[in-house]
């Protein structure tokens, strides 16, 4: 029983760190936020923060992974409810993006701040950074485009479009 209580505390602490760090990154910019500032914002010692994250980069990726997982799960849940045409997949993508922004405006602000790092480090699914930051089963880099590409040539979109180019253009611009 005490072990379960400790695990719940760790999970709550982890979530608190992610929320506080993301808020700081959005308010001040990634470069201007130190590990000490994150610890202070959470009311914890720096050593405690290091228990959860070995460095700032790992913390940034954890925030990103959590946000992407939340967004990806919402997309997949809507697609599992019933089969979607390619046009409906585009609609679902943009509806979920708008919904996420409405529920959590910092969601897109963090992605905007993190975009340069994200694109550089995840351009290839098999890269060392990608493998370290995304766990098997995570909604990761490129999965949004793959979501849109499914059923792409079902006739609901103009014929002759390149599926990958169209999906990437829609999701990353």
Stretch-by-stretch model annotation:
Residues 69-72, 76, 121-154, 164-168:
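Amphipathic alpha-helical packing segments from all-alpha helical-bundle domains
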Residues 100-128:
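Amphipathic alpha-helical segments used for helix-helix packing
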Residues 21, 42-53:
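Short hydrophobic/aromatic patch on the recognition helix
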Residues 108, 112, 152-173:
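Hydrophobic/aromatic-rich alpha-helical bundle segments in the mid-to-C-terminal region
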Residues 13, 56, 63, 67, ...:
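Hydrophobic/aromatic residues within well-ordered alpha-helical segments
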Residues 1-28, 32-41, 58-61:
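Basic, helix-initiating cap at the start of DNA-binding domains
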Residues 27-30, 51, 158:
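Helix-turn-helix/winged-helix DNA-binding modules
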Residues 62, 66, 76-106, 163, ...:
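Hydrophobic alpha-helical connector segments
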């Amino acid at each position: 029983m005490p072990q379960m209580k400790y695990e719940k505390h760790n999970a709550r602490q982890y979530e608190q760190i992610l929320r506080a760090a993301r808020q700081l990154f959005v308010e001040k910019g990634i470069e201007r936020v130190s590990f000490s500032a994150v610890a202070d914002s959470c009311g914890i010692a720096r050593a405690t923060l290091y228990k959860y994250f070995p460095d700032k980069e790992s913390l940034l990726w954890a925030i990103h992974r959590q946000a992407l997982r939340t967004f990806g799960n919402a997309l997949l849940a809507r697609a599992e409810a019933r089969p979607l045409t390619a046009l409906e997949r585009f609609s679902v993508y943009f509806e979920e993006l708008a919904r996420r922004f409405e529920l959590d405006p910092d969601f897109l602000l963090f992605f905007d701040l993190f975009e340069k790092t994200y694109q550089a480090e995840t351009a290839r699914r098999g890269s060392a950074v990608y493998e370290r930051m995304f766990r098997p089963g995570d909604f990761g880099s490129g999965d949004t485009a793959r979501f849109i590409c499914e059923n792409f040539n079902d006739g609901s979109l103009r014929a002759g479009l390149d599926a990958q180019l169209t999906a990437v253009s829609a999701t990353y611009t």
